[in-house]
């Protein structure tokens, strides 16, 4: 039986861009990732898929990159040849993943091992969990409803494409939905349908396998885990964001220039994002908190630094759909170029409640790391003492409880 994942390219581009930095700059780093389902309830306990998940992980760890896949990666100008040589030898190791359940029917997944291994498991495991869960709920009516919703999105994108003013910055969306997709075949169907409806709007996908197959642009730069790792590397905690951004610049020399802002919140990020970084990076990515407030803060920051914000890109990727994206574009288009990464709403809008699942970095080199998100529900760590210390170091107040 072919596994759910049948290509190691079937993941997000930023896994490759981050892994390349890890391999070149801190290959000895050890890390721990933990799974969490944020849903209050599910149709049936996730523990029920444990046996199938174990089998899928076994199949995943038998995969290797093909010469064709390696050739594609080599064609991306920011991927270095020695990294591709490393990937030719690469194989995920099953021993680094532990799967368990608890008495409440919850699924427990831990990935612990070298970061150059552990980091690469995340998207695969989330996509597998999603597909196993929704496979049991699939009926012809579910597919019919998914198709109806997809056709409505395609029609709306056609309307927007017709309404766009060619003299204004373009409205551009990308598929960011690999981790929470219904299944790979559906993700591909969604991208093909929207591309056909509005080729001027659909910019690409974060999924490298589908970007290669469909001949579109793979999209992505960095994730929270990259910046979080620097909380445990050889730098003062107060300087971890600067060290991470400096490391990125050293690796990519101006390529992949979109920085993620919400590891310790936008205000703390902007205190570190000085003139040097603001000139070097092409723009910023929003992934939590109020996107309008966030974008206005970004605009004020560029103004203060006397940088023309119209030369910069704001990328939004937090819980978006087409209407929210279009509204944000209308609000910011006079001040910024914009881009929108839409995830679950594209790849798993079938009428069911989607799974809100994550696999997050919680330790690096035996030391806790944390994300102090602009959305309190997205804060994640396994160490409340470290979280309090992080708040103190960056002057971030405790969130008010309602």
Swiss-Prot record:
GO terms for molecular function: nicotinate phosphoribosyltransferase activity. Pathway: Cofactor biosynthesis; NAD(+) biosynthesis; nicotinate D-ribonucleotide from nicotinate: step 1/1. It catalyses: nicotinate + 5-phospho-alpha-D-ribose 1-diphosphate + ATP + H2O = nicotinate beta-D-ribonucleotide + ADP + phosphate + diphosphate. It comes from the Bacteria. The modification Phosphohistidine is found at residue 224. Transiently phosphorylated on a His residue during the reaction cycle. Phosphorylation strongly increases the affinity for substrates and increases the rate of nicotinate D-ribonucleotide production. Dephosphorylation regenerates the low-affinity form of the enzyme, leading to product release. One of its GO terms (biological process) is NAD biosynthetic process via the salvage pathway. Keywords: Ligase, Phosphoprotein, Pyridine nucleotide biosynthesis. InterPro entries: N/Namide_PRibTrfase, NAPRTase_N, Nic_PRibTrfase, Nic_PRibTrfase-Fam, Nicotinate_pribotase-like_C. It is an enzyme of class 6 (ligase). Its EC number is 6.3.4.21. Pfam families: NAPRTase (PF04095), NAPRTase_N (PF17767). One of its GO terms (cellular component) is cytosol. Belongs to the NAPRTase family. Catalyzes the synthesis of beta-nicotinate D-ribonucleotide from nicotinate and 5-phospho-D-ribose 1-phosphate at the expense of ATP. This is Nicotinate phosphoribosyltransferase. The gene is pncB.
């Amino acid at each position: 039986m072919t596994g759910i994942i049948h290509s190691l390219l079937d993941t997000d581009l930023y896994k490759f861009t981050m892994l390349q930095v890890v391999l070149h700059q801190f290959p000895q780093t050890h890390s721990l990732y933990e799974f969490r389902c944020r849903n209050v309830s599910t149709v049936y306990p996730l523990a029920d898929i444990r046996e199938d998940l174990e089998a899928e992980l076994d199949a995943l760890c038998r995969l290797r990159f093909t010469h064709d896949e390696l050739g594609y990666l080599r064609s991306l100008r920011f991927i270095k040849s020695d990294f591709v040589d490393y990937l030719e030898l690469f194989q995920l190791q099953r021993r680094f993943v532990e799967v368990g359940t608890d008495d409440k029917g919850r699924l427990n997944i831990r990935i612990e091992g070298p970061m150059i291994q552990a980091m690469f498991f995340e998207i695969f495991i989330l996509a597998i969990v999603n597909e196993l869960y929704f496979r049991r709920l699939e009926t012809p009516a579910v597919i019919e409803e998914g198709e109806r919703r997809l056709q409505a999105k395609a029609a709306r994108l056609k309307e927007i494409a017709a309404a766009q003013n060619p003299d204004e910055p373009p409205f551009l969306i990308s598929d960011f939905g690999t981790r929470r997709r219904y299944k790979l075949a559906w993700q591909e169907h969604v991208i093909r349908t929207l591309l056909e409806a509005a080729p001027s709007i659909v910019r690409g996908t974060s999924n490298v396998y589908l970007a290669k197959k469909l001949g579109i642009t793979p999209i992505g730069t960095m994730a929270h885990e990259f910046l979080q790792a620097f909380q445990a590397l050889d730098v003062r905690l107060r300087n971890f964001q600067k060290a991470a951004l400096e490391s990125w610049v050293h690796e990519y020399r101006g390529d992949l220039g979109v920085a993620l802002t919400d590891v310790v919140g936008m205000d703390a990020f902007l205190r570190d994002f000085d003139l040097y970084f603001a000139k070097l990076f092409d723009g910023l990515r929003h992934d939590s908190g109020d996107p309008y407030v966030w974008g206005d803060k970004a605009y004020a920051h560029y103004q203060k630094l006397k940088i023309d914000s119209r030369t910069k890109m704001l990328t939004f990727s937090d819980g978006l759909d087409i209407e929210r994206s279009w509204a944000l574009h209308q609000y910011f288009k006079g001040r910024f170029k914009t881009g929108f990464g839409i995830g679950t709403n594209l790849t798993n809008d079938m009428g069911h409640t989607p799974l809100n699942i994550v696999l997050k970095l919680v330790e690096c080199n035996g030391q806790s790391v944390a994300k102090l998100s602009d959305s309190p529900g997205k804060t994640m760590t396994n160490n409340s003492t470290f979280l309090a210390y992080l708040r103190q170091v960056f002057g971030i107040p405790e969130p008010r409880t309602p």
